[in-house]
């Protein structure tokens, strides 16, 4: 298994950017892979491109526009408004069915062609917002499936799986990239960089985590 190279599933948001810099500390060569799935806000991809260019990371964008046809949701459809809070039943309408499954599967194919075994993704079960494809059991089962499907040994690493948003901010701080993550990333479901709109679930979670980070670790 090649332990010197890693591929990061990279959206340009808080979590994946933290994982990108975590990977840069641990591996000699890091490649970032982003996806164009016809998301409303192309600024997400612009952020990803800008970060990779600025910090000298090889970057690839894969076309996954078909996902928008298969799974209508508030992140890809202009006529669907993002839920401001989680529903009492079911998943938020910002959940894209199959997104992490497809992202990781496509990245695995890409990784094998590059001779890379390690795939890093920023999913977290602690702050998973009700998304079933952010759970550890899903990642573990998919890892086994990909190994069997391609007769190749993958290692899917999830640095954020068991930490909350405050601890994710702390990780960025420890890596020396707190300002980069705070100012140069896009987490907002309404496509606003840095602090975002402040109203969507992603912005609320990000802000809550930052305030808890300041209270717990910076006092």
Curated annotation (Swiss-Prot):
<comment type="similarity">
    <text>Belongs to the QueC family.</text>
</comment>
<dbReference type="GO" id="GO:0005524">
    <property type="term" value="F:ATP binding"/>
</dbReference>
<comment type="subunit">
    <text>Homodimer.</text>
</comment>
<keyword id="KW-0436">Ligase</keyword>
<dbReference type="InterPro" id="IPR014729">
    <property type="entry name" value="Rossmann-like_a/b/a_fold"/>
</dbReference>
<keyword id="KW-0671">Queuosine biosynthesis</keyword>
<feature type="binding site">
    <location>
        <position position="188"/>
    </location>
    <ligand>
        <name>Zn(2+)</name>
    </ligand>
</feature>
<keyword id="KW-0862">Zinc</keyword>
<dbReference type="InterPro" id="IPR018317">
    <property type="entry name" value="QueC"/>
</dbReference>
<feature type="binding site">
    <location>
        <position position="200"/>
    </location>
    <ligand>
        <name>Zn(2+)</name>
    </ligand>
</feature>
<feature type="binding site">
    <location>
        <position position="203"/>
    </location>
    <ligand>
        <name>Zn(2+)</name>
    </ligand>
</feature>
<keyword id="KW-0479">Metal-binding</keyword>
<dbReference type="GO" id="GO:0008616">
    <property type="term" value="P:queuosine biosynthetic process"/>
</dbReference>
<comment type="pathway">
    <text>Purine metabolism; 7-cyano-7-deazaguanine biosynthesis.</text>
</comment>
<protein>
    <recommendedName>
        <fullName>7-cyano-7-deazaguanine synthase</fullName>
        <ecNumber>6.3.4.20</ecNumber>
    </recommendedName>
</protein>
<keyword id="KW-0547">Nucleotide-binding</keyword>
<dbReference type="GO" id="GO:0016879">
    <property type="term" value="F:ligase activity, forming carbon-nitrogen bonds"/>
</dbReference>
<keyword id="KW-0067">ATP-binding</keyword>
<dbReference type="Pfam" id="PF06508">
    <property type="entry name" value="QueC"/>
</dbReference>
<feature type="binding site">
    <location>
        <position position="197"/>
    </location>
    <ligand>
        <name>Zn(2+)</name>
    </ligand>
</feature>
<comment type="function">
    <text>Catalyzes the ATP-dependent conversion of 7-carboxy-7-deazaguanine (CDG) to 7-cyano-7-deazaguanine (preQ(0)).</text>
</comment>
<feature type="binding site">
    <location>
        <begin position="10"/>
        <end position="20"/>
    </location>
    <ligand>
        <name>ATP</name>
    </ligand>
</feature>
<dbReference type="GO" id="GO:0008270">
    <property type="term" value="F:zinc ion binding"/>
</dbReference>
């Amino acid at each position: 298994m090649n332990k010197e190279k890693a591929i990061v599933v990279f959206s340009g948001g808080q979590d994946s950017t933290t994982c990108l810099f975590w990977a840069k500390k641990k591996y000699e060569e890091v490649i970032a892979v982003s996806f164009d799935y016809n998301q409303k806000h192309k600024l997400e991809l612009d952020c990803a491109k800008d970060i990779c260019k600025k910090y000298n990371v090889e970057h690839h964008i894969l076309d996954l526009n078909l996902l928008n046809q298969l799974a209508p949701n508030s992140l890809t459809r202009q006529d669907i408004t993002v839920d401001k809070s989680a529903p009492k039943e079911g998943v938020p309408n910002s959940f894209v069915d199959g997104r992490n499954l497809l992202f990781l599967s496509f990245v695995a194919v890409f990784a094998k062609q590059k001779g890379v075994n390690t795939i890093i993704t920023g999913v977290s079960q602690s702050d998973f917002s009700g998304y079933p494809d952010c759970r550890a059991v899903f990642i573990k089962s998919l890892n086994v499936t990909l190994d069997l499907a391609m007769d190749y040994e993958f290692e899917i690493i999830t640095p954020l799986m068991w930490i909350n948003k405050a601890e994710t901010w702390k990780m960025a701080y420890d890596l020396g990239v707190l300002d980069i993550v705070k100012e140069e990333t896009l987490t907002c479901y309404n496509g606003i960089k840095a602090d975002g709109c402040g109203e969507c679930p992603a912005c609320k979670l990000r802000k809550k985590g930052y305030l808890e980070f300041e209270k717990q670790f910076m006092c």
